[in-house]
Swiss-Prot record:
An example Gene Ontology biological process: positive regulation of transcription by RNA polymerase II
N-acetylserine, modified sites: S2
Subunit structure: eIF4F is a multi-subunit complex, the composition of which varies with external and internal environmental conditions. It is composed of at least EIF4A, EIF4E and EIF4G1/EIF4G3. Interacts with PAIP1, EIF4E and UPF2. Found in a complex with XPO7, EIF4A1, ARHGAP1, VPS26A, VPS29, VPS35 and SFN. May interact with NOM1. Interacts with PDCD4; this interferes with the interaction between EIF4A and EIF4G. Interacts with RBM4. Interacts with DDX3X in an RNA-independent manner. (Microbial infection) Interacts with human cytomegalovirus/HHV-5 protein UL69.
Domain Helicase ATP-binding: 63-234
Motif (DEAD box) on chain: 182-185
One Pfam family hit: DEAD
Enzyme class: hydrolase
One CC-aspect GO term: plasma membrane
Regulation acting on activity, per entry: Helicase activity and function in translation are inhibited by interaction with PDCD4.
Name of the protein this chain belongs to: Eukaryotic initiation factor 4A-I
Organism whose genome encodes this protein: Homo sapiens
Gene: EIF4A1
Amino acid sequence: MSASQDSRSRDNGPDGMEPEGVIESNWNEIVDSFDDMNLSESLLRGIYAYGFEKPSAIQQRAILPCIKGYDVIAQAQSGTGKTATFAISILQQIELDLKATQALVLAPTRELAQQIQKVVMALGDYMGASCHACIGGTNVRAEVQKLQMEAPHIIVGTPGRVFDMLNRRYLSPKYIKMFVLDEADEMLSRGFKDQIYDIFQKLNSNTQVVLLSATMPSDVLEVTKKFMRDPIRILVKKEELTLEGIRQFYINVEREEWKLDTLCDLYETLTITQAVIFINTRRKVDWLTEKMHARDFTVSAMHGDMDQKERDVIMREFRSGSSRVLITTDLLARGIDVQQVSLVINYDLPTNRENYIHRIGRGGRFGRKGVAINMVTEEDKRTLRDIETFYNTSIEEMPLNVADLI
């Protein structure tokens, strides 16, 4: 091996990696119509009733290998239709007559798990498939009863509660044939890696594994090596993904303490539709909410310290449009899927640039238009440039007529 080859293989990290944590596709088949995927009639009805007309880039590539039973690693960002990719694959594969759990989906947050459950139920509406969200913060006894009485076809959950139910044998792995890890980068970084591995040990060795992730840091790929067999790798490249359709601006606020006044000046603009404001810490979410209320601005807030009931009520009000401005943290960036949101404000720039797309990818899902406004202090300028470079995008200074763009 020559020296240049040697250094190249080192730079590339694990097999199937290109530099910069991007996987290399090894599957080129594209099916550009749902009708050509050999899906059941009742599932197709659900897909069209849900409002899908043509499969998105990830759906055109990943549904088929998933249905064929391959292990699949799919790299695609938020807003590309990846939830429906695995939901359709699961619904096509389950045996409706078998009253047993046959597919298990893990997600990093409760909100995301509930959202996935809603998508599965909607797509499977004409099939009579059952799907249950197995998440922390809910009544354990009621959950145990549901699992024992009904044995839902599909379980979507967070790692802690799912492991607990498997461990206590209320959830049986016997018929689980498909295991999906959604937002795998988020789950495998910190905390959940061990729990996922423990869950995996309880599943049958021939269980199909599907892993979806916006980013592919090397530790994610290392973990996939432990529990995936010759996976199909599918990359939906950044340019097919979606900062497209989202106008990105920054406001030069110079100093942190000037952000609040700037936000209040923007408030009238925010309430034209619905807006999400992202902040980096839970404490600061509470602080900003208090400050806004003290100035008689109506805002609602949500973060991980709140109990599940409270979070559900807040999300319900926001989804229905009765609350118009939601202040939240990155934890929930991946669980807010509200069609009407066309404005996202980064009160704080994300500490982790990968989260930028999760935050603003909300606004312009499937090519819907959206506006993102970043508040930038002197210290933030380098981070902003870094984000521009990372996503190969341009973020301009906010024009005075921003209200006309929303």
